[in-house]
Amino acid sequence: MRITDLLKACSVELNGTPQTKEETIKQMVALMEKGGNVTDVEKYKAGVFAREEEGTTGIGEGIAIPHAKTDAVNAPGLAAMVIPAGVDYDALDGQPVDLVFLIAAPNTEDNVHLEVLSRLSMLLMDESFKQNLLKAKTVEEFLAVVDRAENAKNEAEEEKAVNVPDSGYRVLAVTACPTGIAHTYMAAEGIEKAASCLLYTSDAADEL
């Protein structure tokens, strides 16, 4: 499932001005509602806030990925907001957040939010990807940046599947994160990149 299949133009805001974490989430939920993915806005919003109580989704480096899986959602969806001035989101690194992606997943979809979270986290490992999103002047440009990054990622994965070495070392890495799984996915991506630089083959497993 591609990110661009879930992220509609009406659910993207390039000039967000929330002043607090609470305002940020409320505005993100309103963007999600525009996409028609939510049947009960208040219930979905409560689900997002409940997830935040378990641990912040401000993963650091100016990024937050709040999410909720609930029967208040009728179809998987994404919303995105750029906050030029940044906002205090209680992020893990204590820094302001200027890029937020909100994920909505229905209870009927098995782990769809984890799939989306995984793809987003891995793309956001590339600082140039994030900067291009922040610099986007139009929603269309923002979506085009996401589309190009996904295409490049898919091509790299296909090439990796074809060019599996017949010999050499293989590295198995198991990662875990006590504050949420976004860092687990990002760690797995980082391990694979490091292994590639050393010409090793890596199988990074996520402990969810």
What is each residue range found by the language model?
Residues 203-208:
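A short, hydrophobic C-terminal helix/tail in secreted or cell-surface proteins
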Residues 1-202:
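Cytosolic covalent-transfer regions centered on His/Cys nucleophiles
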